Amino acid sequence: MSLFSKIIKGELPSYKIFEDELTFSFLALDQVNLGHTLVIPKTETNHWLDVGQKEYMQVHLNSQKIGKAIMKAVNCPRVGQIVAGFEVPYYHLHLIPAWSIPDLSFTRAKRRSEQEMKEIQKKIISFL
């Protein structure tokens, strides 16, 4: 069972943003920019090319809704979407608040305090 499957099942803690029948979203542990959120299907799938159509569509529909909430929560002009899949072998869509192209670089990723994470979690959820 993957790290993300354990998060979905509640076996590992997370800062949950949104959940429905097919998807789960939570703050990335290492934040590229504050508000960086992952949207994943509940079905464990290694690569985005292999995910079912329903799950793929739901990930993207929810990412649009969550992306709008992130924009309001952090007052950014864009939310970038990135699918990389190198660190965790599970299809996941990164939603990263951005003010410019360099703002999307994973070299910027860092751990935030529990207080910062709880505050941005609450703020994003308030705009859903």
Task: Locate predicted features.
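HIT superfamily nucleotide-processing domains
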Residues: 1-128
